[in-house]
């Protein structure tokens, strides 16, 4: 059975442009208006999407997208700051406690260990011993000088004035003459008559000493008398006592 010629609805749909061209067929154009829609869609899709997808090729977008690159590159500045903050190398300089921990300077017992150095260090104390010897010598010299002065003083006082060690002797002959004169002198003496044979101290020179005495024998008017003579000082001044 035959009908009007046209597309068979039982045949599968073919997109426009494939198979026979029915655009000039009024029946198809009127009875199947939906077939023009794909043509319109194809015609619409060509200009519509093409400029939209070509816009990313616009150089304005690449200029906008690279901007974040320097913007995001700023974290590198923040990343650099941690580098500055993380300069613990400066804090790491606290490893300088190695300077404190240089036990080699403290623990060099080699400088302290050699006992031979200690006697060398005690050597200066030996110099103090020399100083003590010098002080002893000085003290000894002072004592010697003082001793010399003392001895000199003793010698002066003993042999010169008042002459403790000097033994002054009175000439016994002069002493006898002096005793006879005192006995016979009528003004300053006893005014005795016939005074003779005066002998003193058994003929020995008496020692002059204050308070010392010596005895003299004398004959007065033929009578033997004894006279005591006393030294008044260390110079030889004497006093003749009354004849007895």
From Swiss-Prot:
**How does the UniProt record describe the way this protein sits in the membrane?**
Single-pass membrane protein
Superkingdom per UniProt: Bacteria
Print the keywords alphabetically: Membrane, Transmembrane, Transmembrane helix
**Compartments where located:** Membrane
**Record InterPro entries:** DUF4333
- Segments of skewed composition (Low complexity): 45-75, 88-127
Pfam families of this UniProt entry?
DUF4333
Primary localization class, coarse = membrane
Start and end residues of each stretch annotated as Disordered: 1-127
Protein name, as recorded: Uncharacterized protein Rv2091c
What organism, scientifically named, is this protein from?
Mycobacterium tuberculosis (strain ATCC 25618 / H37Rv)
């Amino acid at each position: 059975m035959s009908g009007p010629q046209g597309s068979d609805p039982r045949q599968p749909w073919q997109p426009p442009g494939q198979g026979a061209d029915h655009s000039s067929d009024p029946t198809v154009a009127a009875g199947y208006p939906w077939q023009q829609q794909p043509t319109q869609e194809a015609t619409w899709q060509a200009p519509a999407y093409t400029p939209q997808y070509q816009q990313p090729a616009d150089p304005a977008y690449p200029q906008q997208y690279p901007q974040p690159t320097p913007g995001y590159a700023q974290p590198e500045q923040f990343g650099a700051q941690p580098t500055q903050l993380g300069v613990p190398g400066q804090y790491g300089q606290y490893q300088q406690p190695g300077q404190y921990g240089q036990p080699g300077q403290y623990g060099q017992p080699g400088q302290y260990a050699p006992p031979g150095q200690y006697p060398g260090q005690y050597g200066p104390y030996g110099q103090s011993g020399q100083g003590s010897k010098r002080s002893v010598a000085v003290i000894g010299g002072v004592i010697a000088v003082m001793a010399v002065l003392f001895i000199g003083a003793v010698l002066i006082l003993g042999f010169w004035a008042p002459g403790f060690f000097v033994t002054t002797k009175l000439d016994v002959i002069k002493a006898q003459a002096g005793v006879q004169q005192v006995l016979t002198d009528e003004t300053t003496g006893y005014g005795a008559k016939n005074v003779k044979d005066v002998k003193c101290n058994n003929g020995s020179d008496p020692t002059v000493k204050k308070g010392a005495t010596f005895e003299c024998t004398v004959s007065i008017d033929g009578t033997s008398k004894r006279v005591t003579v006393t030294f008044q000082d260390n110079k030889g001044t004497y006093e003749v006592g009354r004849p007895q």
